[in-house]
UniProtKB/Swiss-Prot annotation:
Gene field: gatB
The name this protein goes by in its record: Aspartyl/glutamyl-tRNA(Asn/Gln) amidotransferase subunit B
Catalysed reaction, written as an equation: L-glutamyl-tRNA(Gln) + L-glutamine + ATP + H2O = L-glutaminyl-tRNA(Gln) + L-glutamate + ADP + phosphate + H(+); L-aspartyl-tRNA(Asn) + L-glutamine + ATP + H2O = L-asparaginyl-tRNA(Asn) + L-glutamate + ADP + phosphate + 2 H(+)
Taxonomic superkingdom: Bacteria
Quaternary context: Heterotrimer of A, B and C subunits.
Catalytic EC class: ligase
Function: Allows the formation of correctly charged Asn-tRNA(Asn) or Gln-tRNA(Gln) through the transamidation of misacylated Asp-tRNA(Asn) or Glu-tRNA(Gln) in organisms which lack either or both of asparaginyl-tRNA or glutaminyl-tRNA synthetases. The reaction takes place in the presence of glutamine and ATP through an activated phospho-Asp-tRNA(Asn) or phospho-Glu-tRNA(Gln).
InterPro entries linked: Asn/Gln-tRNA_amidoTrfase_suB/E, Asn/Gln-tRNA_Trfase_suB/E_cat, Asn/Gln_amidotransferase, Asn/Gln_tRNA_amidoTrase-B-like, GatB, GatB_C_1, GatB_Yqey_C_2, Gln-tRNA_amidoTrfase_suB_CS
GO BP terms in the entry: glutaminyl-tRNAGln biosynthesis via transamidation; translation
EC code: 6.3.5.-
GO molecular function annotation: asparaginyl-tRNA synthase (glutamine-hydrolyzing) activity; ATP binding; glutaminyl-tRNA synthase (glutamine-hydrolyzing) activity
UniProt xrefs under NCBIfam families: gatB, PRK05477.1-2, PRK05477.1-4, PRK05477.1-5
Record-stated family: Belongs to the GatB/GatE family. GatB subfamily.
Length: 494
């Protein structure tokens, strides 16, 4: 869906340039209290087999019953991906044997998924943006988990995860680099978090990626792809793509051919290794599940869910840029996590003049607050400086009560000790000096003491900054910088 691949995205090989082609299948755990076809809990971290119903364990005679909340979450996700919502979809049985799959098949959707084609616009680190096509989103059951470390000669099965609802979100092969793939997964996770349809916690397995990689000479047909299963971090996704592309190029340049196979990524060795030959659809013998009726709902049902959607990242970013004059980069940083955007919105709500100081507030949230949080290894939820306190600091700057330099000192005090910023400014004598007479005396003293610098400044006006620095230093940072600038220009005839 995007422009031809850029030369910088091509991989240099012994026989020339190669293009990597990437498609992703994201498995996102649906945020719901119960599983897709049973009432068993979905909470993470329970004792093994403590969240298992008779349906999840595939006991004879137990029939699946659809969880409507999971259906709603899938529709909300589809709407957030600008996708076609299919008013009729079908659940199919995907037949394969594995010890953590008690039914002997997985209930999934094959030919008739709940969500059809959509798009995601992805901002890249270099400032470019790409549009990634969504092929489909379908609902399916998760499998259980095999425990290999509990006994020296036996493997145990934990079915807590069995039957948990997953959304499989399949992209088109529109990605052309590991950086694009990482940015896409990050954007997709952000959208799902905003929607509240998946918490996106990759450490807990709530979001996992199957990465499809192939290589080709530019302009040639797609090559044979390999699928790297269950990659559970954005960083590992990038590393897996880089390694796999190089591996395939090496084989092809040596005169070999690529086997279509499923591979695993080993983060300790930073390499992929073969797992099994890649199955085709016919290997799974899909057929409609006879225990489940087709899923049908009206357009009115979809429209009602659409009216309840929150403001999504792209919409919020556009509003921040249009209303408060933020740069695209700053707005992008703020909306990249819902918690960050919510904090900024809370600061705006407390400002006395958001129209005047909205941009200043963004600078303080991004540079001062985020910088200090990163330094101390904290996140926005545990910030010692509240939105109300940060808004008060921005207000004090905006109204001219304190300078930016004093504001940074005030921020440190609030971070360490807490307290009301206005009261701290009063109690500690931190107010900015705006009395022109007092400032003028300091300016006159410095000008009189530095005739050589005066001559340099007259010849080279950029030297004015030296005088400003001296005045601010002499006043303890309390002099109004604009007043200092104006006085110096007048005194020096600039």
């Amino acid at each position: 869906m995007n422009a031809p691949v850029k030369p910088s995205q091509l991989i240099k090989g012994a026989t020339g340039d190669w293009e990597v082609v990437i498609g992703l299948e994201i498995h996102a755990q649906v945020s719901s209290n119960a599983k897709l076809f049973s009432g068993a809990a979905t909470a993470f971290g329970g004792d093994p087999n403590s969240h298992v119903s008779l349906v999840d364990a595939a006991m004879p005679g137990m029939l699946p019953v659809i969880n409507e909340e999971c259906v709603k979450q899938a529709i909300r996700s589809g709407l957030g991906l600008n996708a076609q919502i299919n008013l009729r979809s079908v659940f199919d049985r995907k037949n394969y044997f594995y010890p953590d799959l008690p039914q002997g098949y997985q209930i999934s959707q094959y030919k008739s998924p709940i969500v059809g084609e959509g798009i995601v616009v992805v901002d890249l680190p270099n400032g470019d943006s790409i549009t990634v096509g969504i092929e489909r989103l379908h609902l399916e059951q998760d499998a259980g988990k095999l425990l290999h470390d509990q006994h020296p000669t036996m493997t145990f099965v934990d079915l807590n995860r069995s039957g948990v609802a997953l959304m499989e979100i399949v992209s088109k092969p529109d990605l052309r680099s590991s950086e694009q793939a990482k940015a896409y997964v990050s954007k997709l996770r952000t959208i799902l978090r905003y929607l509240g349809t998946c918490d996106g916690d990759m450490e807990k397995g709530s979001l996992r990626a199957d990465v499809n990689v192939s290589v080709r000479k530019p302009g040639e047909p797609y090559g044979t792809r390999c699928e790297i299963k269950n990659v559970n971090s954005i960083r590992f996704i990038g590393q897996a793509i880089e390694y796999e592309a190089r591996r395939q190029i090496g084989i092809l340049e040596d005169g070999g051919s690529i086997d279509q196979e499923t591979r695993l990524y080993d983060p300790d060795k930073a390499e992929t290794r073969s797992m099994r030959s890649k199955e085709e659809a016919h290997d799974y013998r899909y057929f409609p599940d006879p225990d489940l009726l087709p899923l049908e709902f009206s357009q009115a049902y979809v429209d009602e869910l659409k009216t309840g959607l929150p403001e999504l990242p792209d919409q919020k970013k556009s509003r921040f840029i249009g209303t408060f004059g933020l740069s695209s980069d700053d707005a992008g940083v703020l909306v990249s996590e819902r918690e960050s955007a919510d904090f900024y919105e809370a600061v705006l709500a407390k400002l006395s003049d958001a129209a005047r100081d909205g941009k200043l507030a963004a600078n303080w949230v991004i540079n001062e607050l985020f910088g200090r949080l990163n330094k101390d290894g904290q996140n926005i939820d545990t910030s010692p400086v509240s939105a109300a306190q940060l808004a008060a600091i921005v207000d004090l700057i905006g109204e001219g009560t304190i300078s930016g330099k004093i504001a940074k000192e005030l921020f440190e005090i609030v971070w360490r000790e807490g307290g009301d910023p206005r009261e701290l400014v009063e109690a500690r004598g931190m107010k900015q000096v705006t009395d022109l007479t007092a400032i003028e005396k300091v300016v006159d003293d410095i000008v009189a003491s530095n005739p050589d610098k005066v001559a340099q400044a007259i010849a080279k006006p950029a030297m004015l900054g030296w005088f400003v620095g001296q005045v601010m230093k002499s006043s303890g940072g309390k002099a109004n910088p604009q007043a200092v600038n104006d006085l110096l220009k007048r005194k020096l005839g600039l």
